[in-house]
Swiss-Prot record:
The gene is cas1. InterPro entries: CRISPR-assoc_Cas1 (IPR002729), CRISPR-assoc_Cas1_C (IPR042206), CRISPR-assoc_Cas1_HMARI/TNEAP (IPR019858), CRISPR-assoc_Cas1_N (IPR042211). It comes from the Archaea. Belongs to the CRISPR-associated endonuclease Cas1 family. CRISPR (clustered regularly interspaced short palindromic repeat), is an adaptive immune system that provides protection against mobile genetic elements (viruses, transposable elements and conjugative plasmids). CRISPR clusters contain spacers, sequences complementary to antecedent mobile elements, and target invading nucleic acids. CRISPR clusters are transcribed and processed into CRISPR RNA (crRNA). Acts as a dsDNA endonuclease. Involved in the integration of spacer DNA into the CRISPR cassette. Homodimer, forms a heterotetramer with a Cas2 homodimer. Its EC number is 3.1.-.-. NCBIfam families: cas1 (TIGR00287), cas1_HMARI (TIGR03641). The lineage of its organism: Archaea, Methanobacteriati, Methanobacteriota, Thermococci, Thermococcales. Mn(2+) binds at E153, H218, E233. This is CRISPR-associated endonuclease Cas1. The keyword Protease does not apply. PANTHER family: CRISPR-ASSOCIATED ENDONUCLEASE CAS1 (PTHR43219:SF2).
Length: 326
């Protein structure tokens, strides 16, 4: 049985009775085939029993929680079954060694930038971006501090958003990237997709031997899986941004799917459902992998990226970020 993500939008109770997981809401009680669940995303007010959490932990199923506004709150991260002390030590050493950390941080930024360039060319708004990248890549290579790397990344992203705006319809311009709260519809859409993508990457990291809290571009900190932030730089342009662009240009997402709240703009529940339908379809789409010579889903590409990072950390093969060929 192919495992799938389960999204819970309605309020209710998630509990275990004997060896069956149930979700009960105002519409009734529904048994869930736990063997077919890969991970769970909770957007409603859901009470989860300790027995249900114990059952989910046994099955290795992460649960990601989002608040009323669609912002990521946190994850139930089951005890890891793929532990490797040797890899964790190597992962930490690459963080502690400034040169090794800089190599990886720069590669994440480079990969992200090249994927942004791919998007702009696809949308026919790439004027001047390639030349700008050449200049900023020179700055990137000469950077000696992570803060300098982050500064280059921020400038690349700013130029990217400015050009992307030229491809977007009126009423869905980014104008300026704003987050908490997003100040307009496009910012709300991008933030919502990025939040879901981050949680997806956390699930993929759970299924590897990598420690999700040891990262290189983003500073490791408490209360976040910072390695997921590193990997999200690669995938935001080619997953989240492409979905956002398609939804607004094809008129699938409309102004009515947003609401004003928190001095900003947020998706309605119906809007979230529309976006997540497109998101899940996108992750399930297959592309022909040039190295593996076979079709893999876009979600699988995230896991493969983590495996490439592992090979780099253990000295098998230098990491090269995914640059979209599709």
């Amino acid at each position: 049985m192919r495992k799938r993500s389960l999204t819970l939008f309605s309020d209710g109770n998630l509990f275990r009775r004997e060896n069956t997981l149930y979700f009960e809401n105002a519409q009734g009680r529904k048994p869930l085939a736990v063997e077919g669940i890969y991970d769970i995303y909770v957007y409603g007010h859901v009470n989860i029993s300790s027995q249900a959490l114990h059952f989910l932990a046994q099955k290795g199923i992460p649960v990601h929680f989002f608040n009323h506004y669609g912002h990521y709150d946190g994850s139930f991260y089951p005890r890891e079954s793929l532990l490797s002390g040797d890899l964790i030590i190597k992962q930490a050493k690459h963080y502690l060694d400034q040169e090794k950390r800089l190599i990886l941080a720069k590669l994440f930024v480079r990969g992200s930038a090249l994927n942004m360039e791919k998007n702009l060319k696809r949308w026919k708004v790439a004027d001047g971006f390639s030349g700008l990248l050449d200049e900023l890549f020179e700055e990137l290579e000469s950077a000696r501090k992570i803060t300098e790397v982050m500064n280059v990344e921020a400038r690349i992203r700013g130029e990217y958003y400015t050009r992307w705006d030229n491809a977007l319809p009126e009423g869905f311009k980014i104008v300026k990237r704003t987050r908490r709260p997003p100040e307009n519809e496009m910012n709300a859409l991008i933030s919502f997709l990025n939040s879901r993508l981050y949680a997806t990457i956390v699930s993929e990291l759970y299924n590897t031997q990598l420690a999700p809290t040891v990262s290189y571009l983003h500073e490791p900190g408490e209360r976040r899986f910072s390695l997921a932030l590193d990997l999200s730089e690669i995938f935001k342009p080619i997953i989240a941004d492409r979905i956002a662009n398609r939804l607004v240009k094809q008129g699938i997402i409309k102004r009515e799917h947003f609401r004003g709240e928190l001095n900003g703009v947020l998706l309605t529940k119906e809007g979230m459902k529309v976006v997540l339908k497109a998101y899940n379809e996108e992750l399930g789409r297959s592309v022909k992998h040039p190295g593996l010579k076979k079709n893999v889903t876009k979600q699988r590409l995230i896991r493969l990226e983590a495996y490439k990072l592992i090979k780099h950390l253990v000295g098998v093969k230098d990491y090269e970020p995914l640059v979209a060929w599709f």
